[in-house]
Amino acid sequence: MTLSPYLQEVAKRRTFAIISHPDAGKTTITEKVLLFGQAIQTAGTVKGRGSNQHAKSDWMEMEKQRGISITTSVMQFPYHDCLVNLLDTPGHEDFSEDTYRTLTAVDCCLMVIDAAKGVEDRTRKLMEVTRLRDTPILTFMNKLDRDIRDPMELLDEVENELKIGCAPITWPIGCGKLFKGVYHLYKDETYLYQSGKGHTIQEVRIVKGLNNPDLDAAVGEDLAQQLRDELELVKGASNEFDKELFLAGEITPVFFGTALGNFGVDHMLDGLVEWAPAPMPRQTDTRTVQASEDKFTGFVFKIQANMDPKHRDRVAFMRVVSGKYEKGMKLRQVRTAKDVVISDALTFMAGDRSHVEEAYPGDILGLHNHGTIQIGDTFTQGEMMKFTGIPNFAPELFRRIRLKDPLKQKQLLKGLVQLSEEGAVQVFRPISNNDLIVGAVGVLQFDVVVSRLKSEYNVEAVYESVNVATARWVECADAKKFEEFKRKNESQLALDGGDNLAYIATSMVNLRLAQERYPDVQFHQTREH
């Protein structure tokens, strides 16, 4: 049975994001993934080095004029017979709620772990987010060219801390200065390590069979024997790879390598295109939308603000769920029930980013937006429904915001509410006083808000510390019990930007006590947009 051209395009797509702790090697992996996909011939351009290369595309020129850096937000590259969309998840200083929300727009994630350190804090948090939709996870144990922890120990740690079974696909032979390569458990092949630097991919020598004398000759008898002994253990103690369990988010295939040495990344990409799902169905408030449907649907998961005060426009990122986008198409913005013609959407295509006029499920479109689009907005060809599963996340950092000029309270509130609708920050107004508390997931969000309040609303604001550790949205089916809860906890309740009631806890202990005291009240860590 031959698929229609449209369904062939859908079947080719793989959309994924990378989750890792800062410094586990995400940027390097991103570079090398693009290198193996031939999207960039000189690794390093991800960081924007070699500016002469950037002048080729007029799309970049437009970006420079507008001061929006959206180049690396979505990268598309071909690999084997697939088209892969890699969505960037800002890590270091620019970590924000957007990082969490991006994970709601992909069909699969690659978890990168520094094999010298194991599971770290940020990885735990990001894994919790992928659990909301049981997203399939592939794992890459990175930095094998350094001294690493015992590989079995690393697998145990992933299983115990992240509650996901590990199925090793490749297994390392030595590490650090003694790193010799990896053995592929399912192909019965050993790939010998030669360091490739920058954009050179070395020809890898392959030894067939675990008991091949060539293996002993290549890695030394001791390491070859150690490998055989370890594999006995591994086969007895770890999970076998099972595609169904992988797609259900219950086990993760594990690959070992060194991104810096250009080694092992291709094994992982082979697994990604072979096993990761093509664009998945998605739930709305009325029905499930299949990627194979011919009518266009999509949802906005992120809005990138412009830091250049001369240009107020922002780019809304929309994940295509079904149907084909064509330039000049008329789409309905469901929340406002207005039809809009989308003629200048940015498409992120391999290589030439300017002239592509179509996009398919799994692809990401950038929509120009002057404040009319919100996070979670659904676009359709007329059907009135809203995609679910694009939440607000409970902030982890809080500050009180105060005006330099007290007469501008109204503008401040308006600005904060609009910024919260856009997803830049969350705002809480305590019921018992006139404070305004701003909540964020990353520190950068606070700076962005102050500079945008000044440039867009002409309001000068400063922050003060506030005694808030965390927030939870609260609801209760029993109205009488809810009233009692509200009466007794008035000093710790606040309304967010959308007038939803939240409990503001001064410490995690305080939150736990409240949860124990009021078992009928639900305390939610996320809230639908």
Curated annotation (Swiss-Prot):
Keywords: Cytoplasm, GTP-binding, Nucleotide-binding, Protein biosynthesis. Pfam families: EF-G_D2, GTP_EFTU, RF3_C. One of its GO terms (molecular function) is GTP binding. GTP binds at residues 20-27, 88-92, 142-145. It is found in: Cytoplasm. One of its GO terms (cellular component) is cytosol. It comes from the Bacteria. GO terms for biological process: regulation of translational termination. Residues 11-280 form the tr-type G domain. PANTHER family: PEPTIDE CHAIN RELEASE FACTOR RF3. Belongs to the TRAFAC class translation factor GTPase superfamily. Classic translation factor GTPase family. PrfC subfamily. Increases the formation of ribosomal termination complexes and stimulates activities of RF-1 and RF-2. It binds guanine nucleotides and has strong preference for UGA stop codons. It may interact directly with the ribosome. The stimulation of RF-1 and RF-2 is significantly reduced by GTP and GDP, but not by GMP. This is Peptide chain release factor 3. It comes from Escherichia coli O8 (strain IAI1).
